[in-house]
Amino acid sequence: MTIDWQKEVDARKDDLLKDLGDLIRINSIRDIEHGTKEEPLGPGPAAALRKVLEFGERDGFVTKNIENVAGHIEYGDGEEMFGLLGHVDVVPVDDNWDTDPFEPVIKDGKLFARGSADDKGPSIAAYYAMRIIKDLELPISKKIRFIFGTDEESEWVGIHRYMEVEEMPKVGFSPDAQFPIINGEKGILSYEVTFANKDNAESGDFDLVSFKSGLRTNMVPGDATAVLKVNDEAKVADLKAAFEAFVEKTDVKGEFAEANGEVTLTTIGKAAHAQEPKFGVNSATFLATFLVDYKLDGNGASYIQTVAEYMHLDYNGKKLNAYTKHDVMGETTSSANLFDYTAEGDKKVTLNVRHPEGITKDDILANMEEVLKDAGVSIAIIGDVKTPHYVPATDPLVKTLLDVYEEHTGLEGHEESIGGGTYGRILERGVAYGAMFPGEENVMHQPNEFMPIDSLFKATAIYADAIYRLVK
């Protein structure tokens, strides 16, 4: 029996786009500040989970909601289980969008919206692949279970809770990365660097009142703001002129304001996914490189000097001795993404590090402590820690997925590792598969995120063919 998978997708294009639009319109940024006992990760992620499960109920699948933090859509009765793993939460948005990030806009063949590429678009594509198999009543020998999490972009609380109470597949894929395949994922963790408060620190021409930047540990910060107390009014004009010259010659835009004995410096860079920080413009580290040339108070000078010297343009963690390289999994990446400094309070920087096999989290911690031993800091590992994950290229899952990719695209398939962390790493034999195609711009976690419409439909056909081959 020959199935024209692309034809089946084309027959469902309008339905797919409508469902995707309905899901995108839900602002599903994790929001524990407004969480409740019934919706612990916030109302948005819970609403998005319920919406996608509604699609499953409407289409005749078995569904299950686990405490509004995770759930699944299931089809088939086989003893073996094949897993699909997606997420309905999205990363925060900033003010640099050209359109409403939660109102899908189709322009020039692209669907612009937060979550269009990561991960609502690919998840809906994989869901429709599953639906096509059901609609065609194709014979299958395995149960297909599509598991949805609601805080993949942060601490994975939802999926961990799911794993505590539900049976997990041993094999499957997550539609949350790129083609041809991601069969290796680096270890991921964050290091919080806390600066000691120096008593009786000397004042400078300017005192650093605050330095703030960043939305999430896994996002390169798109804007940063420093507030300086002016101790020498004669220095302000030179500061302003130098700042204007600085933003003219660098990759950041800037704003300068003066009021009530203080100046406020704002830099605007470019947000990006922390797995590839080189594609962003880190507004905070750029701002630090400007401020480092000025005489600041003792606490402020120590903070700014450390950021400028050890964290600016250090995409691979070499300055902090966090670097290693693996033949298959590639190089370490490092990105300083959260900055929280107040003169009378905390003074912290959080770095997101993604490392291959060959170095451990404790090795990195010890190396960073040695490098920064004279900076008066303490360093701690915070949040969720993910270890490196690799499924060999010889695995039948990897071989089948690459075969399907090659047949649908005419392109050569090959194994690949990334610094991103997907739910694929949860499974013993789990990988990430699509939905971004080679040569496409990676706009995940960035303003004006988009998914090419044709790629969305092509990915759906690939998913349907691949899933069916693996469960028939």
Protein language model features and the residues they cover:
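Acidic/histidine-rich catalytic neighborhood of metal-dependent amide-processing enzymes
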Residues: 119-120, 124-198, 240, 315-328
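Active-site metal-coordination/substrate-binding segment of hydrolases
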Residues: 58, 81-148, 152-154, 447, ...
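Active-site-adjacent substrate-binding region
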Residues: 223, 237-253, 388-426, 430
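A short beta-alpha structural unit
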Residues: 272, 306-313, 340, 350-357, ...
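Phosphate-handling active-site elements
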Residues: 107-108, 130-145, 238, 296-302, ...
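N-terminal helical capping/dimerization or prosegment-like subdomains
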Residues: 1-83, 91-93, 350, 455
